[in-house]
């Protein structure tokens, strides 16, 4: 009977595990690499945000921006997206932005608005037409943005298609580089035959957790 129990246990396939001694060594290695600046998080313009994130955006992390409708989540992410490129020029990185709420054209419009210190209402000649000089500045600034390694997905998609697209970028365009994935926002993700929004968000979280590993 004891022999039978041992044989049955041989068929058990447990989850991967590690002893705390291994985790402790990994923690010390990480701390040493941070001290020696071998690992440097990506900076934003906001010191408080950087401090809350232990110095900035780190690899292998998922960050969730939460707020009521109209509180500026999309504007914050748009600015952060620009900062990651401009303030971390010593890093090779690619930004993949699932921009489901706002067309990529409008995303760039916000960047132009920020850089030129003009509202989008002014840029779009809603009240008064832009002068030729102002239009030239818009064109020059837009040309500089074309070199940024940012890729937009405008069309809302299912969780599976989002997963497929992230995997494609990991294996091709962003191979051996930082890949920053941005999704705005979760409620616009199409259903994969899930019954409610909570299931969609849950599956989406699984995709992001898998991608960060």
Regions found by a protein language model. Give the residues of each.
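Catalytic cores of large soluble enzymes that bind and process phosphate-bearing ligands
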Residues: 12, 19, 41, 130, ...
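Short, small/acidic-rich helices and loops at N termini and domain boundaries
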Residues: 1-35, 71, 93
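Conserved P-loop NTPase catalytic core
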Residues: 80-87, 96-100, 104-143
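Charged, low-complexity C-terminal accessory regions
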Residues: 1, 120, 165-167
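Conserved P-loop NTPase mechanochemical-coupling segment
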Residues: 136-158
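Charge-rich, solvent-exposed alpha-helical interaction surfaces
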Residues: 3-6, 144, 165
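Short, solvent-exposed coil/turn linker segments
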Residues: 16-19, 118-126, 199-200
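P-loop NTPase motor core
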Residues: 26-106, 154-213
């Amino acid at each position: 009977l004891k022999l039978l129990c041992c044989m049955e246990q041989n068929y058990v396939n447990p989850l991967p595990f590690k002893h705390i001694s291994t985790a402790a060594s990994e923690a010390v290695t990480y701390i040493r690499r941070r001290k020696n600046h071998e690992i440097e998080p990506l900076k934003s313009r906001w010191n408080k945000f950087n401090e809350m994130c232990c110095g900035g955006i780190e690899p292998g992390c998922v960050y969730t921006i939460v707020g009521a409708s109209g509180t500026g989540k999309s504007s914050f992410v748009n600015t952060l997206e620009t900062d990651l490129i401009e303030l971390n020029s010593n890093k090779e990185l690619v930004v993949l932005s699932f921009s489901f709420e706002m067309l990529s054209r409008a995303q760039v419009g916000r960047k132009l608005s920020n850089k030129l210190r003009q509202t989008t209402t002014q840029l779009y000649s809603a009240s008064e037409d832009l002068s030729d000089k102002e239009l030239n500045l818009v064109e020059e600034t837009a040309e500089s943005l074309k070199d940024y390694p940012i890729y937009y997905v405008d069309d809302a998609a299912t969780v599976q298609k989002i997963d497929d697209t992230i995997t494609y970028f990991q294996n091709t365009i962003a191979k051996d580089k930082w890949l920053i994935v941005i999704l705005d926002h979760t409620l616009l993700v199409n259903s994969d035959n899930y019954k409610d929004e909570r299931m969609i968000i849950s599956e989406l979280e699984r995709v992001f957790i898998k991608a960060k590993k």
